[in-house]
Amino acid sequence: FLFQPFTIPSASMEPNLYEGDYIVVSKFAYGWSSASLPFNPPIVKGRLLKRTPARGDVVVFRLPRDPSAAWIKRVIGLPGDTVQIRGGQVLVNDQPVARTPLGAARDHDAPERRVLAVRETLGDGRSYLTYDGGFGQPGDDTGPYRVPAGQYFVMGDNRDNSLDSRWPGAVGVGLLPEENIIGRAEI
């Protein structure tokens, strides 16, 4: 009940995690919910021994529309935050997340596709790599999302190849309820 192995199901977290990679999920990092238990039994409402994910954490969670599916994304917006994407630039509470272009890269999932490798650095100094497919990609421009209490805004690091909180729950993740979080990815 403390740790769980997890296989990366898609290319949405490239260039940091690749489809088929194995990681360990710390199920106690944020406390427990029914999502932390095998088969997702609806026996617990909310989280026990609740701790809050930090912006930049990579979390594994049960997809709200299909609790049998486990997905992985990076936490971008916390409860109370406003998140918006303008021209591919992530803004949290109207502050742009710092971006440093690193040069062209080949998309591992589609080797014929060239992307821009970018280092994003959060306000607290945490940084990570992302892929940017260029201007005009779906999801590059959004309205503001106000993250309500008990929910999170999550994104894949392969920004133009990720169904995440930029997309409504019927297609992507929508805003992620905290009780759907299984745990933190320990990479």
Feature map (PLM): residue ranges:
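Aromatic-capped interface at the extracytoplasmic side
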Residues: 1-13
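Soluble "head" domains of membrane/secretory-pathway proteins
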Residues: 4, 15-187
